[in-house]
Amino acid sequence: GLLWSNEYVKNRATVLLSNIERMGIRNAVVSSSHPEPLCDRLSGFFDKVLVDAPCSGEGMFLHDPGAVEAWSPEHVLSCAQRQGSILDSAAKAVAPEGILVYSTCTYAKEENEGVITAFLERHPEFILIDSGVTFGRASETLPQTRRIFPMDGGDGHFVAKLQKTTGESYGGEWFVPRRNQSDAVQKQGKELYHSLSKEKNCPTILEAGTYLYLLPEKLPDLTGLPILRAGVQFAVIKKNRLEPCHQFFTAAT
C-alpha cells in the first residue's frame, strides 16, 4: 500500500517528513500542497483518507495558552468554513466504497457536527457510518460520531467516519522514472540493495541529483506536485561509489 501524508504549512511538513523518517515508514509520500489541487490530481485514488482538520483548538486550552488567546467566535466560524472546504477537496480523492475520516481537537459544534451535517447535504454520495471508536461518548445529534472529553481520557476530540457510495476510481497517469537515469548507477544501486537486504525483489530506484530513492509501488504521477519525499532515501553518490543513507537502515528494521 501507499501512505500519502500532506501538510500545507511548509515548516510543519518538514516536521512531518522527519517523523516519517524516524518511524521507518517505507511506503510514504510526503507533500506540502493546498488540498484542492492535490485532491483534484488524485481524484478517486485513495481507499482511506484522514482529514485531521485545523481547528480552533478548544481542546488544547489546558496545554496551550496561545490557543486561548487566539480564540474568538469569529475564529470558530472561520475554522468551520475552512474545514468544510478541506473536506470538499478530500472527498474527491476518495475511491468508490472508500472511507473518509474527519477529526478535530475542539468542542465547538460548528466545527464538528455542523461541518459534517453541511458536508452530507453537499455530498449525497457519502453516508455517515459508525466511527468504530469504543471510548468517549456518542454525539447527541450525530450518534455515529464520537466525542472524547477530558473525563473520557481525551482533550475534546471529535471523530466522524464517512463512506463514499458512488464515484469514479483514479484514472490519472502513473509515475514513470525520467529517461536520464544512469544505467551504471542503477546497476550499482541494485547490487548495493541486494547486499544489504534479504528481500529478493529490488524496488524501483530513482536517481535524483546525488541521491537514490527506493520508490513505493503503484505511485501516481508526481509531476508538478510539491513533493518533499517519495519513498526511502537509499544512498548517496560519492566519488563514483554509493554510500547507504541512514534512512534506509531505519526503514529496514
Identify the residue ranges that each predicted region occupies:
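Class I S-adenosyl-L-methionine
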Residues: 128-153
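Residue-level signal for inorganic ion chemistry
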Residues: 3, 16, 49, 98, ...
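Local beta-strand N-terminus motif with an aromatic residue
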Residues: 45-47, 124
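S-adenosyl-L-methionine
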Residues: 2-44
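Conserved Class I S-adenosyl-L-methionine
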Residues: 113-135
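Polybasic, low-complexity RNA-engagement segments
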Residues: 155-158, 165-253
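Helix-to-beta-strand junctions that scaffold the AdoMet/dcAdoMet cofactor pocket
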Residues: 94-96
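Mobile active-site "lid"/loop adjacent to the S-adenosyl-L-methionine
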Residues: 11, 48-86, 105-112
